[in-house]
Amino acid sequence: QMGKMRLTTRFVTAFVGLAALSFGLSVANASLADDAPKTYTWRTAPKHSAGIAPDPVALRETAIVQVYVAPTYGGRRYVAVHPWIIVKKSGETAFTRYDVVGWRAPDVVQRNYALPDGLWYGERPQLLVDHRGEGVDAMIGEIEAAIVSYPYADTYRVYPGPNSNTFLAHIGREVSALKLDLPA
């Protein structure tokens, strides 16, 4: 009688364990299925234009400032983003992009490292800030001064920083007209 009870308990425990394992694997597989099309590596990830930035040639006479953010590459994409800023003064026909890129150390502040609105290693950016027209040329001057005054231009740490978020937070604090409030 006692032996049958132990056998039944073991069987039930094994069955529940297998069911839990099966459920866990199904959940894990389902979460990976959302990423299924993204079978690229950081080397092969698409970095083409997302088609968000306006045509700088068509808007030659308009000063423009935009801030973008995209999920980071790999597993960190669930907890971290990569922001950058693009600027175009009145009369210019191209954007200048500024961001901080850790693997470019010791010169982590990069100018035109990637396309103005390019995918960040396969991730589509989101537009956070868009300023155009009157007063924006002056704002660009302040932004460029903030970039020069960034105190961590040769330092990068994923966590807790300084990193690309620290860079944009610095610019946001220095240029109030930008209306960009990011945590450092």
Residue ranges and their predicted role:
Residues 3-50, 145-184:
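Activation targets extended, charge/polar-rich intrinsically disordered C-terminal tails
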Residues 33-131:
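Glycine-rich catalytic cores of cysteine/serine-nucleophile enzymes that process amide/ester linkages
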Residues 3, 17, 24, 51, ...:
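Residue-identity detector for glycine
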Residues 80, 87, 99-102, 111, ...:
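Solvent-exposed soluble domains appended to multi-pass membrane proteins
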Residues 52, 64, 85-86, 140-143, ...:
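Weak global preference for isoleucine
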Residues 107-169:
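Mid-length scaffold segments of soluble, non-membrane domains
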